């Protein structure tokens, strides 16, 4: 297996993980806002996410003479460690599935601020002790405190967004829900309404797959808080991804026939025939898979408490790639910039 031993290699892994893990949520949100059912998107995502883990395991896990290699460990009696790795994958899959719906209700930037901050607070604290305290506590834990403050700022941004949208939409009646297929044939023209106006919000609502008007945003915040997630690194990541794939596959096939949150019913045949946004969904899965793999590798070299901090990039990408409505009001701009400053 390939083992990273240099500081430069560790930094490279961290930077690539930052880029990949910060990009895929924006891509997933893009497909939902274009009307693709989240069940279809997640099924595509989970396939390429697993494929990325397989590629990493059979390449980086085999190319070096260092032992034990990936294939060697597949036949070893290490089931206690395997079960721990698979448990982590299950929690990751449930968390990712929850955040996919939270993005629609709360917004990408707010969701990522809260989920990533909670994940870093819990994960970094646990990993510090599990790593035999190899990281400096006087540096690590002040950063953890900043993430706790970021949760408060994220809630403030959410409150500002909700009040702003409510004032803009006064006088408009509730919108009728439409299916993903209907949105593909809709006559709505992109860019017709000015970003941030009531007309723009209505256009987005008509086109998106998850309808949020008339529903309490407390649902989204509740989903957001729920979302918080002796083998070699490649074998552990492989089993981690296998369990994540299994849970995501089973739950989303169930959601095809028994959808939640008022989504239209679909079928496995409809999923196979739905090529609208499939390429983006595949790309999101690859980015997340390789990002997680690089985070595992960087964590092996620098300590998993330090590697857990790569979650902060999700905030920057969530706010600036998706734009959402944070630029509409100076108050929201100040809140968001404060969050980014605290978490950098």
Swiss-Prot record:
* Ranges of the Extracellular topological domain: 1-10, 64-78, 123-136, 230-235, 300-344
Keywords from UniProt, A to Z, are:
ATP-binding, Membrane, Nucleotide-binding, Transmembrane, Transmembrane helix, Transport
Membrane topology qualifier? Multi-pass membrane protein
Q: What compartments host this protein?
A: Membrane
Q: Does the record's keyword annotation contain Acetylation?
A: no
Residues reported in the UniProt entry to bind ATP: 209-216
Q: Which InterPro entries match?
A: UPS_plant, Ureide_permease
Q: Record's GO cellular component, any one? A: membrane
Q: Which residues lie on this side of the membrane: Cytoplasmic?
A: 32-42, 100-101, 158-208, 257-278
Q: From the UniProt record, which GO molecular function terms apply? A: ATP binding; transmembrane transporter activity
Transmembrane portions of the chain: 11-31, 43-63, 79-99, 102-122, 137-157, 209-229, 236-256, 279-299
Q: List the disulfide bonds.
A: none
Principal subcellular localization? membrane
Please verify whether the record's keywords include ATP-binding. Answer: yes
Name the job this protein performs.
Proton-coupled transporter that transports a wide spectrum of oxo derivatives of heterocyclic nitrogen compounds.
Protein family per UniProt: Belongs to the plant ureide permease (TC 2.A.7.19) family.
Q: Write the protein's name.
A: Ureide permease 3
Q: Which organism is it from?
A: Arabidopsis thaliana (Mouse-ear cress)
User: Per UniProt, what is the name of the gene that codes for the protein in this document?
Assistant: UPS3
């Amino acid at each position: 297996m390939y083992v990273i031993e240099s500081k430069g290699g560790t930094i490279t892994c961290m930077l690539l993980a930052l880029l990949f893990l910060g990009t895929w949520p924006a891509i997933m949100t893009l497909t939902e806002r274009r009307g693709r059912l989240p069940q279809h998107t997640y099924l595509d995502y989970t396939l390429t996410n697993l494929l990325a883990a397989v590629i990493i395991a059979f390449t980086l896990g085999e190319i070096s003479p260092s032992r034990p290699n990936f294939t060697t460990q597949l036949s070893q009696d290490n089931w206690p460690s395997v079960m721990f790795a698979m448990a982590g994958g299950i929690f990751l899959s449930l968390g990712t599935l929850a955040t996919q719906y939270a993005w629609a209700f709360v917004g990408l930037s707010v969701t990522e601020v809260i989920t990533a901050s909670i994940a870093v607070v819990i994960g970094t604290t646990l990993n510090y002790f599990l790593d035999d305290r190899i990281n400096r506590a006087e540096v690590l834990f002040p950063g953890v405190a900043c993430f706790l403050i970021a949760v408060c700022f994220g809630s403030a941004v959410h409150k500002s967004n909700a009040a702003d949208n409510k004032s803009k939409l006064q006088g408009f009646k509730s919108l009728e829900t439409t299916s993903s297929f209907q949105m593909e044939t809709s006559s709505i023209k992109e860019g017709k309404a000015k970003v941030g106006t009531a007309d723009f919000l209505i256009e987005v609502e008509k086109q998106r797959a998850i309808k949020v008007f008339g529903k309490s945003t407390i649902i989204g915040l509740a989903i957001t808080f729920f979302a918080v997630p002796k083998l070699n690194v490649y074998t552990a990541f492989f089993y981690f991804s296998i369990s994540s794939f299994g849970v995501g596959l089973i739950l989303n096939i169930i959601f095809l026939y028994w959808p939640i949150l008022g989504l239209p019913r679909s079928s496995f045949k409809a999923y196979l025939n739905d090529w609208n946004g499939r390429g983006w969904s595949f790309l999101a899965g690859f980015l997340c898979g390789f990002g997680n793999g690089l985070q595992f590798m960087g964590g092996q070299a620098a300590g998993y408490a330090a590697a857990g901090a790569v979650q902060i990039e999700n905030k920057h990408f969530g706010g600036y790639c998706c734009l959402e409505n944070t630029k509409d009001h100076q108050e929201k701009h100040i809140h968001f910039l404060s969050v980014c400053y605290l978490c950098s």
